[in-house]
Amino acid sequence: MTRIAVYPGSFDPLTFGHLDIAARAARLFDELHILVVHNPGKTPRFSSEERVELIRASLPEAARFGVSFPPSSQSKVVIDTLDGGLLADYCHRVGASVLVKGVRNGVDIDYEVPMARVNRDLAGVETVLIPADPQQGFVSSSLVKQVADLGGSVEKYVPSAVVRALRASAKNQ
């Protein structure tokens, strides 16, 4: 039986913390779907398609920063989008039995536990919470955007493709 998991997030933008959670999850499951989702509570900087491309461009670079994905023979990584509908429906459609969520602190856990219960009720999907690496646990996409918008260096927190995209978006604002 193939063990399929979904790692959902807005990934706006993708950070090394996101890549670390994805790589660790990919070692636990036969197939991992990194799913770019629309969060109605947020106004995205990048379109869903741009975020998918940034993730694709960043995967090869991940190893340079100590994030290693398992060989493709051991785990398949799929990058997809969900711009509408329920996450539970997506899980059912792709045959996923697990959601993967990264948690940085107690606030994240307080947010994720009720969501986990709803996803289990709606689709029978269990949620696995993976603690963030302490070196990346304080980094959020919002913080990265704020620092980049003010001209600060974010190279320690995001892959080079994301750095370039942030610089380009700052010029267009």
Which sequence ranges carry the predicted segments?
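Nucleotidyltransferase catalytic core that binds NTPs
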Residues: M1-Q173
